[in-house]
Amino acid sequence: MVHLVDSNPGHITKAERAGLEGIVANIYNTDLSERYELLDVGYLLAFTSSDEVNDYALSRYEKIFGESGAYRLITVDELKGRMTPSEDSVFSYTEDFINLSESNRESAIVREVAFTTTAQLLELMAHAAADVDIAPLFIKYPDGQLHVIPKDPTVFEITTATTCHLVYMGSELPATTGAHQKTEPEEEER
């Protein structure tokens, strides 16, 4: 279950229309640790346009809601190389809030494309880097689990005869040789 916490009731209404659980709350004023709806949260994702809010969300709630992982968006200074991002809490090393917003504006469809080797993943990441309207999000393992893309994708190891998927948003990526592409993976699996 995905829960969106936001102080803007309009954002919560949109999230609920999309099938998410929404809580209208200000993380600075509200103690979310007492909210029963959030007791089963394993991942914390701080995805606001404010670096300060993202940092605050992690520092205040990571130990409560981030038992399986806690991530924030990369800052502009980290993205531009003016600061070094922390290795353990950055969701994407290539996409900040603006980049994700632009990819969503281009195409809000979540897509996935298969790859069977690290070389194919690197090829896909290079295509994504060359197109500002593509935002890589996760690597999907054969068991369906989603994992954050490592800072250095060359370290990603894939076992022989295994097909993983790059999950991304935005324009369509070309399929790698011998791989196939799916659009809106959640819809096709139903």
What are these regions (language model features)?
Residues 1-190:
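Cytosolic regulatory regions of ion transport systems
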